């Protein structure tokens, strides 16, 4: 299991809010995580989680976010089975032990 390192920041208050969460990585993105389906990561919210993933799995953010840094429309992010679109988006707070699932949208016809 990959455990990304924390970015070095000068604001000590930032570190007080960091939580370790489990991130479930879909198969198409596992090439960025050395084949790992689950990663433990440290972040205070979903936006910081995406940045931490990018810092430790270079190139993954371009697959997760559009040019404006917003989650791509065809990917759904869930925190403990709750869609972040109905919470606070990338500002959705994370707590220790939370599970974040990244799920590609499925469509059919």
Swiss-Prot record:
Pfam families assigned: ThiS
Name of the molecule in the record: Putative sulfur carrier protein slr0821
Top-level taxonomic group: Bacteria
Family: Belongs to the sulfur carrier protein CysO family.
Any one of the GO CC terms: molybdopterin adenylyltransferase complex
Gene Ontology annotations of biological process type: Mo-molybdopterin cofactor biosynthetic process
Residue stretches spanning the membrane: none
Entry-linked PANTHER family: SULFUR CARRIER PROTEIN CYSO (PTHR38031:SF1), SULFUR CARRIER PROTEIN SLR0821-RELATED (PTHR38031)
């Amino acid at each position: 299991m990959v455990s990304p390192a924390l970015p070095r920041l000068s604001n000590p208050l930032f570190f007080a809010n960091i939580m370790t969460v489990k991130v479930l990585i879909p198969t198409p993105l596992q090439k960025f995580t050395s084949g790992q389906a689950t990663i433990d990561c440290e972040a205070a919210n979903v936006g910081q989680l995406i940045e931490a993933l990018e810092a430790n799995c270079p190139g993954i953010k371009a697959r997760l976010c559009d040019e404006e840094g917003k989650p791509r429309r065809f990917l759904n992010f869930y925190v403990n089975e709750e869609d972040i679109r109905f919470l606070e988006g990338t500002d959705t707070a994370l707590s220790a032990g939370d599970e974040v699932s990244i799920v590609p949208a499925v469509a059919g016809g």
